[in-house]
Curated annotation (Swiss-Prot):
It is an enzyme of class 1 (oxidoreductase). Gene3D superfamilies: Electron Transport, Fmn-binding Protein, Chain A. It comes from the Bacteria. This is Pyridoxine/pyridoxamine 5'-phosphate oxidase. Its cofactor is FMN. FMN binds at residues 61-66, 76-77, 82-83, 105, 140-141, 184, 194.
Amino acid sequence: MTTLADLRTNYSRASLDAADVNPNPFVQFDVWFKEALDAQLPEPNTMTLATVDESGRPSARIVLIKGADERGFVFFTNYESRKGRELAHNPNAALLFYWIELERQVRVEGRIEKTSEEESDRYFASRPLGSRIGAWASEQSAVIESRALLEAREKEIGARFGENPPRPPHWGGYRLVPSSIEFWQGRPSRLHDRLLYTRDAASASGWKITRLAP
């Protein structure tokens, strides 16, 4: 039997220093994301989204990032799903990107806001037809008796809307507006590099960079 405690990797691909990063964390994220794309990593656009319920119990799931700029990080989902309900109660959330092949993580913390109706409409219209139908067919996170019922619902929605299903009112975008963004680079002997960006109105870039102990 595999002994989990014995599984370990010594990271040594790169280093991370404040003198070498961009003072703007969104620019730095774009640099790292492009490097993940260039490395042809499988689905570098996946990220873990962590939320909490009314009792303070956390939950996490993988979602896909669909936009990142100076305003924040965007993803789309069902507003009535578990994550949607939790975000309605508590808009504080965290994101985690993990690019294991590059020995890198990016941690983002902040508050969630909904994107505009126009932004949600625009992205929904760009989705494949099957995904647009699925947004109507699935009552995400609800208990269902069988997959057959889900597939029957899919056929019903397809027959109703044809090639042009509109965006459901319960489906749309969220934007995480970050208060902090941490860049993590694996290093030998577990002495990893960690640079934390936090908002700082006195800084020319609007952000302060500090180094954290690993």
